[in-house]
């Protein structure tokens, strides 16, 4: 019995923690959270909502407080309300590639969901390694710290390393930090106030 306990304690939490996290997220119908991103362009704070098969809503807190973006996969367009919530006035209809609706690092609204983020991490993992460090806590929540690092000479969109902190129970990312080949931080993203499979109002993603 003691031997079985020791084996269980020393076994990896997941054979592939990134694939396990992605599988959990792919099983969700949607989620909402507060996203805090820090990079060379400063800080962005967004109240973010996602619903399958790809509906996205961003309510901006910083730097463009009050702006609202909604992406609908059925139209392939982003509706932008620069100064207020939808329903009060007509929004601008833009392509996802328009610079007005891209982040300071060039991220597109239609490629902003957590599943896409993890698939980007997997691209680095395919050309390198993933390892789980000692159990830790983030904001008082038990978490798995996973490091994904490309082999020398490899990079995916400048990124050669990701540090991820996954919620120990849900495997949902709580924080993701990316680094370039010089070891300099490209971006740090914190995901807070996470609500999985919420009941969105019927007009939450309406244009």
Report each predicted region and the residues it spans.
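Sec-dependent N-terminal signal peptides
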Residues: 1-10
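N-terminal mature ectodomain segment of secretory-pathway/periplasmic proteins
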Residues: 13-84
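Short, solvent-exposed helix-to-loop capping segments enriched in aromatics
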Residues: 23-26, 111-125
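Short amphipathic beta-strand/extended segments with alternating polar/hydrophobic composition
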Residues: 45-49, 68-74, 87-102, 188-191
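Gly/Pro-enriched, hydrophobic low-complexity segments
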Residues: 57, 61-69, 77-79, 125-207
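Acidic/charged, solvent-exposed loop-and-adjacent secondary-structure segments enriched in E/D, K/R, S/T
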Residues: 79-116
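Glycine-rich, flexible loop segments associated with nucleotide phosphate handling
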Residues: 109-112, 118, 159-164
């Amino acid at each position: 019995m003691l031997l079985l306990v020791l084996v269980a304690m020393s076994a990896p939490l997941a054979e592939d923690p990134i694939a396990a996290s992605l599988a959990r997220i792919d099983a969700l119908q949607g989620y909402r959270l507060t996203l805090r991103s820090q990079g060379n362009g400063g800080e962005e704070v967004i109240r973010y909502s996602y619903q399958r098969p790809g509906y996205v809503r961003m309510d901006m807190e910083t730097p463009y407080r009050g702006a609202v973006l909604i992406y609908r996969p059925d139209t392939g367009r982003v509706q932008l309300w620069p100064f207020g919530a939808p329903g009060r006035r007509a929004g601008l209809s833009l392509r996802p590639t328009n610079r007005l609706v891209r982040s300071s690092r060039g991220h597109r609204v239609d490629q902003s969901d957590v599943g896409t983020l993890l698939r980007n991490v997997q691209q680095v993992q395919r050309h390198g390694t993933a390892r789980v460090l000692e159990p830790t806590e983030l904001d008082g929540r038990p978490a798995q710290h996973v490091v994904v690092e490309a082999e020398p000479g490899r990079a995916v969109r400048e990124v050669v390393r990701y540090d991820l902190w996954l919620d120990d129970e849900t495997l949902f990312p709580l924080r993701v930090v990316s680094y370039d080949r010089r070891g300099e931080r490209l971006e740090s993203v914190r995901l807070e106030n996470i609500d999985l499979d919420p009941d969105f109002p019927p007009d939450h993603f309406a244009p």
